[in-house]
Curated annotation (Swiss-Prot):
Species: Mycobacterium marinum (strain ATCC BAA-535 / M)
Name of the protein in its database record: Adenylosuccinate synthetase
NCBIfam families found in the cross-reference section: PRK01117.1 (NF002223), purA (TIGR00184)
Cofactor field: Mg(2+)
Keywords: Cytoplasm, GTP-binding, Ligase, Magnesium, Metal-binding, Nucleotide-binding, Purine biosynthesis
Catalytically driven reaction(s): IMP + L-aspartate + GTP = N(6)-(1,2-dicarboxyethyl)-AMP + GDP + phosphate + 2 H(+)
Localization annotation: Cytoplasm
Residues engaged in binding substrate: 299-305
Family of this protein: Belongs to the adenylosuccinate synthetase family.
Length: 432
């Protein structure tokens, strides 16, 4: 069986956890391939139980599925252990969670530098979560990072931490006037934490490719979204990794020819957290309505999300840069009771109209949305389970979004629960 990539097609928070949870019972492996605990997935089980996950793949909530934290993820050991304990305390079996030996570990000095840098930047700050994700990826690229496998060799670990702190302490003390970190204490603390996860360390590349050879299905789960990709997003207001489909192969060790389906998760309106351009952002009662009705607060940060109407320009862009084959449209139910629903079909920049993503961020910052008004619907759609159960105007909205986004809408979310989903096309069956 081929691998399936699940990606966010906007600025994150599209509902990827719901999609993974829906597919989880029909796949054998779920892999998180990038990011860290700077993002969160919310999963609501049929029982009504609500789980917020930050590092661990959403498939952990589906019995029998093997979950992998891939080499592209940066792992805060303390957060990992805390999340595991939280799941186990609620009766979740975590025995089938594995961690790639090549994933990088987020160290105390990454968090310290991230926080003081953000404060130092003041009004020029990017708006990071302050969890050390960026500094950890910086060390990875600079070839001075600490990898999961390093905890298996105490001498090697001590040498690497000491070398890293020779520089990091200079930054903390001389630039930011903070206390230096003691290498021995950092190593001792990490080794204590490693006792809680060393039995999970694995050669993930080998296991995943063996699974595909054996005919098993692997779901590659991204965090954040396309417009937060360090290469293809609204730079510099982005994350430090590649949430796009191209990052799935790199962050998991699965070759790109193994991937057949790219499922884009697309919210029926648009949100983003933090700073950066957002052409359809609303500052009126409509924005307040979307925020309140959609419960738009970050799983990880608790920050209120900025809200706006659906933006077909970024949806088409996401389709193109990810090679999206299918869309999962979420939170359609939030739009119920609106008289009309505007949809952005293009931008006007300096008097010129375009239907494509601007090449420069300065152009995107000046972009004014060009709207197409679609009729709304008043009916409660949360109990709909077939496409024909939806009101005609809701169906028309979906079909129009499908047309302007450039890929078929195969699934539709009409509520937070796993069962509150309309499946128009069976992605696993048709792509097998």
């Amino acid at each position: 069986m081929p691998a399936i990539v699940l990606i966010g097609a906007q600025w994150g928070d599209e509902g990827k956890g719901k999609a993974t949870d829906l597919l989880g019972g029909r796949v054998q492996w779920v892999v998180r391939y990038q990011g860290g605990n700077n993002a969160g997935h919310t999963v609501v089980l049929p029982s009504g139980e609500n789980f917020a996950l930050h590092l661990i793949p959403s498939g952990v909530l589906t019995p029998g599925v093997t979950n992998v934290i891939g080499n592209g993820v940066v792992i805060d050991p303390g957060v990992l252990l805390s999340e595991l304990k939280g799941l186990e305390d609620r009766g979740v079996d975590t025995s089938k969670l594995l961690i790639s030996a090549d994933a990088h570990l987020l160290m105390p000095y990454h968090v310290a530098i991230d926080k003081v840098t953000e404060r130092y930047m003041g009004s020029k700050k990017i708006g990071t979560t302050g969890r050390g994700i960026g500094p950890c990826y910086q060390d990875k690229v600079a070839r001075m990072g600490i990898r999961v496998a390093d905890v298996l060799d105490t001498d090697q670990l001590a040498h690497k931490v000491e070398a890293a702190l020779e520089f990091k302490n200079q930054v903390l003390v001389k630039i930011y006037n903070r206390k230096a970190l003691d290498p021995d204490q950092v190593v001792e603390s990490l080794l204590e934490q490693a006792e809680g996860f060393r039995h999970r360390i694995a050669d993930a590349r080998l296991l995943l490719n063996n699974a595909l050879e054996a005919g098993e299905t692997v779901l590659l789960e991204g965090s954040q979204g396309t417009l937060l990709d360090v290469d293809h997003g609204t730079y510099p207001y982005v994350t430090s990794s590649n949430p796009t489909a191209g990052g799935a192969a790199v962050g998991s060790g699965i070759g790109p020819t193994r991937i057949r389906t790219v499922l884009g998760i697309l919210k029926a309106y648009t949100t983003r957290v933090g700073s950066g351009p957002f052409p359809t952002e609303l500052f009126d009662e409509s924005g307040e309505y979307l925020s309140k009705t959609g419960g738009e607060f970050g799983v990880t940060t608790g920050r209120r999300r900025r809200c706006g109407w659906f933006d077909a320009v970024i949806a088409r862009y996401a389709t193109r840069v990810n090679g999206i084959t299918d869309y999962f449209l979420t939170k359609l139910d939030v739009l119920s009771s609106l008289e009309t629903v505007p949809v952005c079909v293009g931008y006007e920049i300096d008097g010129k109209r375009t239907s494509e993503m601007p090449m420069t961020q300065s152009d995107l910052c000046r972009a004014k949305p060009v709207y197409e008004e679609l009729p709304g619907w008043w009916e409660d759609i949360s109990a709909a389970r077939e496409f024909d159960d939806l009101p005609a105007k809701a169906r028309d909205y979906v079909l129009r979004l499908e047309e302007i986004a450039g890929a078929p809408v195969s699934c539709i979310g009409v509520g937070p629960g796993r069962d509150q989903t309309i499946v128009r096309r069976d992605i696993l069956q048709e792509r097998a």
